[in-house]
Amino acid sequence: MRKRLIALVALAAATFGLLPAHAAPTVIRSFITSFDDTPIVYNLFLPDPADTPAPWPVVLNGHGWGGSGSQSAGGFIGTLLSEGYAVLTWDARGFGQSGGEAWVDDPAREGRDVSALIDLLAARSDIANVGGDPLVGMIGGSYAGGIQLATSAFDPRVDAIVPNVTWNDLRYSLFPNGVVKLGFDTGLCATGLAGALGGGLSADATAGPQTGSYSTDLNLIEAKGVALGYADPGTLSWFRERSVAGYGVENPVAVPTLILQGITDALFNVNEAVANFDHVAAQGAPVKLMVFCGGHVACPSNYNAGVAGYTNAATMKWLDRYVKGIESVDTGASVEYATNDGVWHQAAVGFDKIATSWTTVNGRGTLVSSGAKTSVINGMAGVTYATPSHPLDPGTLTIPTAITGGSTIVGIPKITLRVGGAGPGAHLFVKLIDRDENLVDPRPDQVVDLQEAAMRVELIDPLFPQTIRFDGVGVSYVVPAGHRILVQVSTSSGAMSEYRGAAIVDLDATIRIPML
């Protein structure tokens, strides 16, 4: 991390303790021409100099997949302005009114677009700047989190980032252990394409009419996924290049990083946040992880979502500490996580190392994999998150545990499956179930934190059983009074694809559950 003490001390003195600004900010909407002549439309919000004198540090705030840069000074952008930050939003290539094609936060394309925007900021006298190096932070969720990682890995001018509900490895996000995450994959394709095609066609568009679109590669990948039912090696390689797990091997993220992740997020689950946390920590850079209730899947109505605005306050502290350089700011414990009762907890070790004991659960059974959905889903099927399987489902093994009300589960379960039987293959899904023991009818069962782990198994043979070990999905859960935890292993899912082909699966399962 760069040491710019004189400039940072002066900046801190100018901005610390300011009251919220009351005047409307200045908003500049324009575009730059990126490295390959693609127009990138941006919005630059500047605080009222009567309230906060220039120069200002700047925060780049991206947008989600299929969206466009905010043109409103409300919400957290307004909070940043009142605290003496300029804010820049932009339409990522292929979306909004920007030109080009969407390449899924490719460092060589979208990453270079952001570097061009930083060039623009570096040339402005009203942006805090030392030797052409502006004070830059980045925030935003999902696609806007991915671009923070892709930019900061290659552009040393980024001082701090706050990626929210984003990925470490898109191969795992979209095709966990070889299984297509059907609900999210198809939904993202449709939503993103609508955003790409509709945003820039107006005659009065900032950079002129633009026909946004996906890259040809991405269109082919979607078609192959639908046709094959799994991701081929070329698809996996393409997504690796757009993941910290890929480019970060030689170009690591080594800037102060506050990672925000939703415990019920079934697209980018907490395992990805743990991987990003470990990656940044390995570079010796400051890193913090906050696990909250929500994400791409909303916090369930029977959970307590906790203190409103808690992560926003932590974000502001992170920016003040590492962008403004106010060393007296306390950013708190390296890991904070919320449980379903709304309580925030602090830890000095990684999320996957918090557990103080493990409960081991064993079960054995024979399952049917029909190549189609066999689960009887309770009520309306959720297409993006895990739902319980009926105990009488022939494709499901339900295993009781000794975990009852008042117990706390925190961390990443460990799964070992010994698979025999007969058939070309099967998809196996493992989830923790919360059951109210006061009820005979299992329909109110709920999957703990709405998460399930998936595994693709090929060539099931009765003479050569396979032993497969993999991680479950991380959870942070306090079991309600009168409830008990079960484990289900199923051959079907309401949110992911089933194996295309029938099989009989002889299963011996061992699941280790992390406890406090």
Regions of interest found by a model, annotated:
Residues D51-W56, N61-L88, R93-G99, A266-N269, ...:
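Short substrate-entry loop that stabilizes the transition state in hydrolases
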Residues A24-A54:
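N-terminal cap/lid segment of alpha/beta-hydrolase-fold proteins
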Residues N269-H279:
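Short alpha-helix in the alpha/beta-hydrolase fold that links the catalytic acid
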Residues T26-F31, A282, I326-L516:
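Glycine/threonine-rich phosphate-binding loop and adjacent beta-strand/alpha-helix elements that clamp
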Residues V253, I259-Q261:
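Short beta-strand/loop motif that positions the catalytic acidic residue
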Residues V280-A298:
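Catalytic histidine neighborhood in serine/cysteine hydrolases
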Residues S82, G111, G131, A150-P252, ...:
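Accessory cap/linker subdomain of secreted extracellular hydrolases
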Residues D48-P55, E101-R109, A116-S142:
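Gly/Ser-rich "nucleophile elbow"/oxyanion-hole loop immediately N-terminal to the catalytic nucleophile
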